[in-house]
Amino acid sequence: MNRFKHVLLLFTLLALILSVFGTALAEDKILVIGWSENTDAYDPANGFTHSTHIVNHATYSQLVTFPDEDASQILPQLAESWEISADGTVYTFSLRQDATFANGDDITADDVVFSIQRLQNYNGNPSFLADGIDSVEAIDDDTVAFTLPAARPSFLSEITSAVFSVTNADAVMANGGTDAMDAAETDTAGAYLDSTSAGSGPYVLENWEPQNRTELVRNENYWGDQPYFDRVIFIHMPEGATQKAALEAGDIDLAFDLSPDQVAGLEGNEAIEIYRGPSTLTHFVIMNTEEEKSGPFANPTVQLAVRYALDYEGYKTLWGGVTPGTNMWVGFFSAFGEDRAFSRDLDKARELLAEAGYADGLEMELEYPDMVYGGVSFNTNAQKIQADLAEVGINVTLLPGEIQVALERYRSGEHGVGYWLWGPDILDPLDFLSFMPPGKVATERNNWQLDSLPQDIQDMIAAAKVASEPDERMALFTALQEYTQQNGPFAPFNVPEVATAYRSNLQGYIWHPHWLLDVAILSRAE
């Protein structure tokens, strides 16, 4: 009966898609994408999920950017040039003078200042990324200077993020926005920016119906090359099977969240192209370091036992991808490869649990979002975690939650033990330090404090933040990864494979390690 209901629901959803969007693919200028939406906001100062980054990359511009195909160099975007002070603490950007916002307003240094200060003061989910900026100042209409507390080699990479989008200050202020120090309490522009965009990207956000669809329209005032598609429609399809069926039927152009098995089922279909490759994402178990929240899982010995209990090869069989050496994404600068990955050892896990006083087993409640991302079902992985830990006497109760509720508990550090997915905020190894105190994931989300670390590790963290020479950085990040393999409240267990598929007449598809998908470079064969 349950299977019948599932099949009926699938065909009902496909019928709805066809009735609403069925003519879209017949019109060459409309792009339809199936995805599992995971955003809670499109306001650049508040939204901080993969869905947010994809949409805001299309609707906003930043001072600098990466090439379309990779993250190999920093390129000008709204800034046509920049200078760095001798001590590495002041970055001065000269703005291009032909760029305008979607409503036709000129982009000025004051807009840059407003956008950065609002990001800092709004205290939204991504605001921490601007913590390392002491001040931002408009020198004149076309020149803006950032002052940092200390030299930071990753700064230019950081500000490529859609979090640092330049917003139209006048439009945002007219709708309740402010960059004042009390913006967290007084700014009311969130609803406005979640329903439309105030940027200068190739598209404009026209409509967002949470957990249903997001619609973009072409920005006719775009200062760069006009995109091919007049309209882009993202349809929320939480199940990869639904995306696969819609793609095969020709009802969508691109299926963004497919499992390796689902992609394999599309092989040989001449109407469909397939992309596979390693992602920059990491699935991990997080154990709160406050005992009143996670109980025995605040104990470092128990945390290590959990790491030894997980069946790393099993997750690779389920979803493809690779086993991470640490939370740093496999394949990046200094990241441990599979040759240094953590290995399962059930005897060691049981020995550690006995050492911690739990030879007879213990109970765990595992919190996680009830969602699918990249074709990976969090429920399926959670059930696998449950089965793995049962083999060493840890009885796991699964607590799936609605994405917004689960995110709030995770981000506020109120969770006990959780299962989450993480991707880099910036394409620099410094981002790995988010998993070490006082990094955001470690401390704000998991209450792991800097003073709990040995002094030599604290010193390494401080040195890694300012090191610029490749050999020095390599040595520091290698040592820090060695430490976190054996210590700390995280158990990273899989870097999943990117598996997407699209209609063969869709041209220009590139999976990008930073913004994942750039709809502005796509076109359709005539």
Walk through the language-model features, giving the residues of each.
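Gly/Pro-rich hinge or "lid" segments in bacterial periplasmic/extracellular proteins
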Residues: 68-69, 162-227, 346-347, 351
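Aromatic- and charge-enriched surface segment that lines or borders ligand/interaction sites
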Residues: 80-124, 139, 145-147, 243-246, ...
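Ligand-site clamp/hinge motif
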Residues: 96, 191, 219-265, 395
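A structural "hinge/loop" feature
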Residues: 37-54, 78-80, 105, 155-165, ...
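Surface-exposed binding/hinge segments that line
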Residues: 128-181
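Detector for C-terminal structural segments
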Residues: 54, 209, 218, 283, ...
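N-terminal lobe/hinge region of extracytoplasmic solute-binding protein
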Residues: 34-86, 117, 198-200
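Structural transition elements
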Residues: 203, 293, 298, 323-356, ...
